[in-house]
């Protein structure tokens, strides 16, 4: 049995807290507040409403058959939010107010679309949920044709080691 290839794409977003005041102390406070907002924003971006909105966009962009290779669907024909959430990893970039989004899927175009769809809807959902600051996209996700999993070399070496152990014993 062969493991299917998985592809990854990523995008970065910048959290900005602003007061409208422009001086050195206010700028330092804005940077500090932005770093504190990052975790709040990441929780908002993992919410079911955000996942459902991304799922709707994916259904508009891709054939349901292709999507079914990556996600499970509910009785209404929508992508299950939990199956979509499992494909997305959100992390902070150390000592910054940047958020890195990594999406992994069995199709490289879907992985990139997940990232780009998230960045397109994030400002609206963050504004509604938090009401403070903003989130901006730093770059756009690209389609990477090189699979990130399974690691063929690692799996081959592990298989050879296991076979060697069986032969030796």
Residues covered by each model-derived region:
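Hydrophobic and amphipathic membrane-targeting/association helices
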Residues: 1-169
